[in-house]
Amino acid sequence: SRGLGDVYKRQDYGHPVSGLARERSNGNDDIVTIGGSGFGVMAIIVGAERGFVTREQAAERMLKIVNFLNDKNTDSYHGIWAHWINGQSGETISFSRKDDGADLVESAFMFEGLLAAHQYFNKDNQVERRIRALINDLWRQAEWNWFTKGGEDVLYWHWSPNNGWSMNHQIKGHNECHITYILAASSPTYPIAESVYHKGWANSIVFKNGKKYYDITLPLGSDYGGPLFFTHYSYMGLDPRGLKDYYADYEEQMKAHTLINRAYCIDNPKGYKGYGEQCWGLTASDGDKGYSAHCPGNDRGVITPTAALSSIPYAPEYSLQAMRYFYEELGDKLWGEYGFKDAFNLTADWFAPSYLAIDQGPIIVMIENYRTGLIWKLFMSHPDVQKGLKKLGFKTPYLN
């Protein structure tokens, strides 16, 4: 619990004007990340519930965030935000040369947090009523179906006024983007048709898998499952327990992906230092050679604490083993003022100086989901989400 309290302080690295999450601890102070802020919103709820902050403090912070997102000076495109925003002015900060407009996936992570917050801040007082009203406005303004590029049976990741559809990145499964389709189907105002899910998301050469790795069958995704953040970002709100659709049992998918990632680290085919039963977890993070999406197919010797820690609902015993190892064996090299640093490579004797919002947020939220299911229960209780899941043919205990 002490550790969780320390990690929770990570949220104090919020931007003073917007209340949103800064992208990283060692970067430009005005860059806030929309996806990481969605995770931050969920972490704020956890903080209030655990008593790290009062409910009133959490509500004030939440109000600051939704006021900023609703402000006419904060850029959005058909109701969808950019990946990076200036936390002072609300202006878009380009993520890459052509990526200077809407980012549908990052915005989906934001809405995952906002809909959970809508359900959490349910008191009949001025501040919480205002929070709910502003979240409803944002939710109703988001034009999910615009991102079918004029009615195609697939969602596109980016659009900008300057570059139109030139990024041309179709969102297909299976990866971290599942929540994007769920929310798009759940929209009360600009929903996608179910065919967009079935012919877009599920129609990809790396969607169905079914092969065995280390004797573990992987239902969906690329070989070995890819980086572990695929099991975190969409499923911080979306509860995979008992969640099934026409294609997969998502509880099975999350567990298999996690156990395969760990088994690969134990096998350690590249012979990196440190890998083993207690030291495992490959996912996207900083590394000694820069940022990379680490996974069995892209293994650079970098272990990222968020990989094992955020997988605690899927493999609690192994996750806690890793947590103990990181804390007790690596100690001060890895533990700092905001909890565990982003990553380390023992072969290169390298420890990240940084903390990233998209890596810290899931740790807090997934530990809470493991303990009480708090964020899962909130998100899954939203009536629009339930309608969307029903529309796409999902089965979940929440629909009974």
PLM regions with names:
Residues R2-N400:
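Ser/Thr/Asn(+Pro)-rich, low-complexity disordered segments
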